[in-house]
Amino acid sequence: MSDTPTLALAKDLLSRQSITPEDAGCQELMIKRLEALGFTIEIMVFEDTTNFWARRGNEAPLFTFAGHTDVVPTGDLTHWNTNPFEPTIIDGMLYARGAADMKGSLACMVVAVERFVGEHPNHKGSISFLITSDEEGPFINGTTRVVDTLQERNEIIDMCIVGEPSSTSHVGDVVKNGRRGSLTGNLTVKGIQGHVAYPHIARNPIHQAMPALSELATTVWDNGNDYFPPTSFQIPNMNGGTGASNVIPGTVDIMFNFRFSTESTVDELQQRVVEILDKHDLEYDLDWIINGLPFLTDTGDLLTAVVNAVDTVNQQKPQLLTTGGTSDGRFIAQMGSQVIELGPVNATIHKVNECVNVEDLEKLTDMYQEVLNNLLA
């Protein structure tokens, strides 16, 4: 039995070792298919990252499929049951690095658009693709740079589906209609280095920092809302000392991270952190990295179209959640766009033996096509 168009394209994409920020020819495969449909292609290379913007039509609304061709490293190959770049089907599951995150989605997007354009060559509005090879890496030269370019020429995305693996047990059981923001602080608390036997002529920055860190960890930053849980504060990294047992360190470095809801702003969180640090009379340096702002699509044509499309295919409406980490949707949402994430089951992403249900890929293709039918037919 021959492969379906979705499965065949997925296998072709998965056979390419596009470990971030490499693309390994994946985008060329997609571009050829889209050019045949009348898409105008614009390749955007920024340093080590390859991106492309493809558009069919010049009218509003502008609907976009967004995704990435890069994948995370495989890890120890001896822990894989198959070659991660030789897509293999076992018991109805397609195994390969990127099967779920997110080359499977890319194949579904392309085939869905091929079918839709074949049925509706004079469709309403415009369809576009925003594809990058820098989602799994530092996300500096990928989607964010393409969005900047589009905004500079006032080309604004109205609605966007990001193909990130949103589902939990079967495709379409969960869609993400928002994401929390991410704010990282790099804090250096300064003390005075000395001998542990003479603490009176030294100043231990670890001891000094602990009460402030305790307060930061126990502070209620907000109460969340109907769509987001309360803002969370975590310390993922802390480093101080020389490694010797008889030396009081001169500094301690603490990295902390907020995952914050729409109930808090970056300025508010930064101000409250500084107030707590100053209250404890610390000598410190503090640098901030805004990894992404929260976004939410709680109403609108896109949300309605996605919910109805999933219901048509699954005979069950999806659950709307904002859980999980950040995605490139945060950059697109800054344009004022409606953004929804709909993709495969995420149970094996970034793990060895990453896989996706072959039937789910067919259903996801149908869902994407139905979204287009609902919006642009």
From Swiss-Prot:
Q: What are the binding positions for Zn(2+) 2 in this chain? A: 101, 136, 350
Group of enzyme by EC = hydrolase
Q: Which pathway does this chain act in?
A: Amino-acid biosynthesis; L-lysine biosynthesis via DAP pathway; LL-2,6-diaminopimelate from (S)-tetrahydrodipicolinate (succinylase route): step 3/3
Which reaction equation describes what this protein catalyses?
N-succinyl-(2S,6S)-2,6-diaminopimelate + H2O = (2S,6S)-2,6-diaminopimelate + succinate
Give the cofactors, semicolon-separated.
Zn(2+); Co(2+)
InterPro entries on file? ArgE/DapE_CS, Bact_exopeptidase_dim_dom, DapE_proteobac, Peptidase_M20, Peptidase_M20_dimer, Peptidase_M20A
Q: State which Enzyme Commission number(s) the record gives.
A: 3.5.1.18
**Record's superkingdom?**
Bacteria
One Pfam family from the UniProt entry?
M20_dimer
Q: How is the cofactor bound?
A: Binds 2 Zn(2+) or Co(2+) ions per subunit.
Active-site residues per Swiss-Prot or TrEMBL entry: 70, 135 (proton acceptor)
Gene3D superfamilies assigned: Zn peptidases
Q: How does it assemble?
A: Homodimer.
Q: Which family does it belong to?
A: Belongs to the peptidase M20A family. DapE subfamily.
Function text:
Catalyzes the hydrolysis of N-succinyl-L,L-diaminopimelic acid (SDAP), forming succinate and LL-2,6-diaminopimelate (DAP), an intermediate involved in the bacterial biosynthesis of lysine and meso-diaminopimelic acid, an essential component of bacterial cell walls.
Q: Which HAMAP family match?
A: DapE (MF_01690)
**PANTHER family from the entry?**
ACETYLORNITHINE DEACETYLASE, N-ACETYL-L-CITRULLINE DEACETYLASE
**The protein, known as:** Succinyl-diaminopimelate desuccinylase
- Its source organism is Aliivibrio fischeri (strain MJ11)
